[in-house]
Amino acid sequence: MSFLWGSTKSKKGKNKKAAGSLPSGVVPQQRVKPTRKNVPIDYPRTLEKVHGESLIFRTSLLSELVSTGKSGIGPPDLIHCTELDKFHDEKIGEFFYITGIDASSVSMPIAFLKLIKWNDGKKLKSASLKNDDITTYCTFNIFQKLDIRLRYESEDVYQVNIVDCLNGNNEIPLSDLIWEETFVSCCIRSVIINSDFERKIPGLVELPFVFENRCASDYKRVIDSLCKFLPRFLECGWDSTKSVYATILNNYLTESLLVFLSITPEFITDYAIQVLDNLMTNDPSNSRYYAIVIISIMERSNDRDVEMIKRIHEILDLLLPVLYGLPSDEPYISDLINCITDVLSIQARFLLNNNDYELSLSISTLATNLSSDNFESWYLLSKGYIFSQQYDKALLSINSMPCLAEYDIVKQAQINAFKFYMNYYKAPLCHSREHCTMTSHELNHLMNIMHYENELELKTIIFGRTVMPNESKYGCIEEIWNKSCLELGPICGPQSDNLINFVSQQEVNTVGDMLLLKRSKETRQESWFIKQVRLLLMELVARIGWNALLQLRSDVFVMESKFKMIESSDKLSTELRQKRLCQRWFDAMFLDVYEDLSISTSSQENKATAKYSGLEWELLGLTLLRVSDLPDAVACLRTSILARFDPISCHHLLNFYLTMDFNDEFMRRFDVDIILDLLVKLISFRIRFYDRFQIFSLQVLRKLEGQLGSEIIKNKIINSPYGQAGITSVIDYMLECLSKNRNEACLAYERPLPDLPSTIKPLAD
């Protein structure tokens, strides 16, 4: 089942009729008499201040989010455990958040909750005996705004409850549709949360979902469900920092499908296209959605250009005549325009990548004329003008872009609500403060149930009221786990674009360059929109220089401050009439870029004598990255990692490798041994804090495997200084997930872990 938990011996018992509501066809599970001895604890636990408060918080949170239309993809799933402290005769509540549980039926969560009790060494009692150990699993259905709650006492006693988050009604009957919607909801949450560090909370457990058994039938089940639900993409929400509105390509459902395909074997991509082709035939009313998603899949696969171009022409030939034949007040027209502009953007991007700038400009111009508030169309138009050396028009195009939201209000509502959770977590800040806030009574309770004999040893893994054990050492590199992990804690949440919020204040105060510190604090949580526009500006700087860009700006624009100085009675000069008013956000960007360039220039002057801390090297590297000084940025980020393993610097370095083409000149400077070293260390750091999914790491490993081959990667790791059993088994597992030869057979696990009890069924059959 799940490698998150260890194993134990089991005694076979007689099958008994379940008192719960298992669906027909599910075989009653046999009894297990577990023993806690030698069973590793590999999940976190947060001790509640008041028993049951995490469940109360979830209820109020979902009610508020749903009533205000901000539920989005919903919060992570919740596991709540009730235990009895017999010495003080009181109930103690523990909980943690989790993604990746297969909630396609009740049997999967039941098996999971059973393992939690087994992992804690608790006796699974029969229905005739009093059971004070109650475990509850909660998961949110995005589509019907329902919270499915499974209350589990034993294999004989459990109850499934469905709560309408809008009105509190809990008498809703279970149905196959609800389970299917919940499964898709879990798919979306697993992918989106794993890809977005702002959404994560300390102690979040991220299981590898259907990847664990590396079974083609499991992969296909995800594809079938996600593709089937594509017409319901509007119900899933979208990231408003990347698009003004949801489209068939700008939504969390389609994003989840595309990301999922990026970490599965190639034959799964073929299967997805086949499924979508069948849906086009069987569901003609939504065929345009399926056709556009197929085109997007082909764009990402890199070896289907001819077929993609053919399909682009087919869909445009179908949709454009329909658009031109509709009256302007037709309600259907906005969706049709969105579909067409999505396709045109793919076409324009393809032409840009193939150096056909003239045709790309004509396509992008058509797209912006159809939809003036589509960011992607304006971005590609600006890029086309830059590449064709029409720099004045590029500036005008950038100025015409819709200024996207700094933050997504739906996501932010959930993040703000989870600040409640942060009362349970206290970052170590490089051991600069006491980060265990539990009472002696609570520590004694933990020592008893976790079988710790040394209180000081236990306190090293307690962060506030959250305990973070990882006893199996799966993915362990000792130097990472015993140093950076304990000093920094999990790197997640808002303002996690650099380490300022994760190191001691004393280390922050050692940063000598005040401008560097100021800009680093301002960019701890920078919007996606600003990052994209800066890329265009830095491309202009690389081509014509900063001073020439400033001169071009003054030729094209009049600044708002100067415009306000003009009296209304004054006649505008011919020169001013020919200029555009520079948008305020665009004007501010020039000031930010100027400050970053000043830092870059200063660093070049002080390069020979610079003596920086690890934090300063990171902040300088990220600043140089913002101004596209890639060679020096890479050098600074690597130096930061040498001073102290820095997962943020590591992520950026690996992202260079991931996003660059193999033929790129800068790409040739990357040593694959260095890339592999960084990747393995990042995997180890993140798996220490329960990220067993690691989409980004799988994407990097997939590219690395295409360059080296899996056997060379395995041999390099075995012969490396970190070739410890804990990490080598993780890499082997990830390579198996990506293997091109995994057609239909499910592969047995090869990791050196004890056998699971015979009564525990796999999560994915």
From Swiss-Prot:
Region: Disordered, residue numbers: 1-31
Pfam families from the UniProt entry: ChAPs
Primary localization class, coarse:
Golgi
Bilayer topology annotation: Peripheral membrane protein
- Chain segments carrying region CHS5-binding: 735-765
Q: What is the lineage of its organism?
A: Eukaryota, Fungi, Dikarya, Ascomycota, Saccharomycotina
| TM region(s), chain numbering | none
Top-level taxon in the UniProt lineage: Eukaryota
Name the record gives this protein:
Protein BCH2
Write the record's keywords in alphabetical order, separated by commas: Golgi apparatus, Membrane, Protein transport, Transport
Q: What this chain does, per the record?
A: Member of the CHS5-ARF1P-binding proteins (CHAPS) which mediates export of specific cargo proteins, including chitin synthase CHS3.
GO cellular component terms, alphabetically, are:
exomer complex; membrane; mitochondrion; trans-Golgi network transport vesicle
Gene (UniProt): BCH2
Record text on subunit structure and interactions: Component of the CHS5/6 complex composed of the 4 CHAPS proteins BCH1, BCH2, BUD7, and CHS6 as well as at least CHS5 and GTP-bound ARF1. The complex interacts with the cargo protein CHS3.
Q: Where in the cell is it found?
A: Golgi apparatus, trans-Golgi network membrane
